[in-house]
């Protein structure tokens, strides 16, 4: 993550009067489909929500960056003012993961350990704390965050560990993903992490995490945590000496290169699945949630939603596997949250809880913290639903039929590609930009999909702006923007 004061930037560009108005207009448009409601936090409570867990009986648990866990009753009530807060636990260390499995324990990922917590005398306060695993290191550096997953399909909790600062790994497994088994055994699983911001499974049960711009990360990414894989930053690879199950240490990448070039040299290299272009989609990718609500959150079943802490937004992600490798497209989804989006939790009834904080990096939302809800209104926005790669271009599907005249025009689409330098230095500008012409457009008979024939660039992000496309009823796209990350071309 890298702090950039958006207010100062706007003032520098001379857009202070116009940009907030435009942003408010977009948020108002989005609110027709996905309204935001705010749960009022009691005075004196600093609820920087690091993690959220849905509990039975309309209750949620919320952990804070100050080491507390709060219960929120009536969290789903139509009237958010009826929410009631009670402190369950305190004295913990920046809890960035919460999960349960119906046995009375709450599992909390702290900076230095995975802990399970219980209220044994039913007085509403935790009184039993047990260490499940503490096999990684911590030395007090601000950057040594630890994020924890929900239980995976095998009953494991995954812990993803930030590096020490941006450039070193001073303690065991900093820059790694670890699996903690139900018995408390630690299994080093994936190397090459830098600065995680969130972790979750997709609908197939595979684990993904967000990583942030910095050394070896030209931008913010969504990456697949493939067991045995290396995801790009070699700083923590010194700990292969402690991870016999992982095999030999991968070859170090060459700086000032490109990901496809280094991937060809390093068999363990798992390329980023999704790139979030810096200062276009956001600046600090954070929490992740899969939509498994069977339509209760709208038309995006089995897609992922990803927060951005600096921009106070939630983005949308469509993933596909091509030649066995994950890749796909990201889209804007919802802006206008009160603080920096950090934690997401999507309940089975279609309520998405969004926890916010601005400490450390600042946020557009403007408030130091917030706990909010996002719900689907029942109205379907006109959006690109999915973006599939084909051997000769892309296929777009839409949430409603398109107008064949506007959707069938080449002029309705703007298209370019670019990539990032893969380097040890911090971040990267966009490089190697191309503007391949769209050779032809074919609209399906039912109007639900469009085929774009165009050249593809391996390892590039493909930026598509279908600003001229209208729905059959004449509506423009709510978000006429997509970025497809191309790791593989279909054979």
Where are these regions (language model features)?
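Flexible, low-complexity linkers/stalks enriched in Thr/Pro that connect modular domains
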Residues: 484-491
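Structural beta-strand segments of beta-rich domains
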Residues: 392-396, 450
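Bacterial N-terminal signal peptides
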Residues: 7-20
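Surface-exposed, short loops/turns at beta-strand junctions within beta-sandwich domains
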Residues: 455-461
